[in-house]
């Protein structure tokens, strides 16, 4: 399936494809 967002942003970046930083958690783009 698709990767799940939800990791903590690191310096404003998310490493899961298709996710963006909604500080402090990554959200689906």
From Swiss-Prot:
It comes from Melicytus latifolius (Norfolk Island mahoe). Disulfide bonds join 5-19, 9-21, 14-26. Probably participates in a plant defense mechanism (Potential). Binds to and induces leakage in phospholipd membranes, particularly ones containing 1-palmitoyl-2-oleophosphatidylethanolamine (POPE). In vitro, displays cytotoxicity against cultured cells but no hemolytic activity towards fresh erythrocytes. Not active against Gram-negative bacterium E.coli ATCC 25922 or Gram-positive bacterium S.aureus ATCC 25923 up to a concentration of 64 uM. This is a cyclic peptide. The keyword ATP-binding does not apply. There is a cross-link at residues 1-29 (Cyclopeptide (Gly-Asp)). This is Cyclotide mela-6. InterPro entries: Cyclotide (IPR005535), Cyclotide_sf (IPR036146). PROSITE patterns: CYCLOTIDE. Keywords: Cytolysis, Disulfide bond, Knottin, Plant defense. Belongs to the cyclotide family. Moebuis subfamily.
């Amino acid at each position: 399936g698709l990767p799940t967002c939800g990791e903590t942003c690191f310096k404003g970046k998310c490493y899961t494809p298709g996710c963006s930083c909604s500080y402090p958690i990554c959200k689906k783009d």
